[in-house]
Each structure stands twice: as C-alpha cells, then as structure tokens.
Amino acid sequence: MMADYQSSNYQKYKNPNPVQHWLIVRFYTAILELLVKINYGSLLDAGCGEGLSIQKIMSENHDFHIYGMDLSLPAIKLAKNLHNQLIFIQGNVLNLPFKDKSFELVICLEVLEHLERPEQGLSELLRVSGGFILLSVPNEPYFRIANLLRGKNLSRWGNDSGHIQHWSANGFITYISHQTRVIAWRGSFPWIIVLCQNHL
C-alpha cells in the first residue's frame, strides 16, 4: 500500500497536467540520450526523492547495481514502498555515506540549487564517483519565467522558496568546470542537464 506521504517533488512528476507531463517526458528523454554515451555497472541517485528517476532509468537498463539516497526520511520510506527490490538509504549529499569511487555513475537531479555550498556537494559526488556524474539544475531565468506563466510563486517573481542558487546554462557549466570535465549537456526547458567525467 502506498504511503500517504507525497512530496512536492513527487506531485510534480505525477502531475496529470499535459504540459507538465510533456516537460517531464522531455527531461527524461534528454537524460537517457546522455546516458547512452557511457557504460556503467553501478549507480547512485543522490537526492533520489521517491525513486522516480531511478524508475525511468531502470526502464532502459536492468543489469547494474542501484542505490538511492535522500535527506528526507518520508521520501525514502515511500521509495522503498514503490521499489522494494532496490536499496534506498537516508543521507546527506554534503557527507555521502560511501567510500571513494563506490559507483561508476552518480546522478544528482535538481539538488545543487538548494545548497548554500554547492561546491561541497559537487566534491562529494565526485569523491564517490569512479567514472561519471550526471547533474541537472533549473536553467535561469527560464525556470522562473515558466513558474510565472503558470501563476506559481508570483510574490517571489517565480522563484521557488528552496532555490538558493540560480544558474544560466553557461553559468552552471562554467561553475562545475572548475571541479570536473563536462562531456555533454542538454537543455530541456526549463532545466539544464550535464554529463561530466570525474577527472580528479
């Protein structure tokens, strides 16, 4: 039986609105287009929420080890309920509970914009990655424009209350290039998705 808990993230991905659904489909299509460029046998989704991204990736790939981690205990409980064949743990992206180079691929979707020190989070993602990381963040100002167009967060000019960092596509690529090597990226309105290789 599904838990009563549903985060705003879960509601966003399950929203029946056709435009919202179309944007989410495009988002995951772009992610899968990037992932076909690499080989990996183990995956960590850091900031996995309820495991919906893992579910999308699993639909295309089956033969690898998957871990999901999130700060929210209710989200982890729901993820375990929805995907009981996978491993989900509670943890903080700023202090990942894994050894160095534990995973061939680490994904972190829509997390870094919530961090006061995103460089610390990125360092941890790189530490536990033995190969690649896949990141996504809102592409500003398009994310806020999209919110305004649908009447969301009007008093904050479209900005989500939890978003501390605001990057354009070029700004984000420049920012992460100080710590990792960008292989490829995709713009999927209103997000940017970047595939990087751990060169540390």
What are these regions (language model features)?
Residues V111:
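Hydrophobic adenine-recognition pocket in adenosine-nucleotide-binding enzymes
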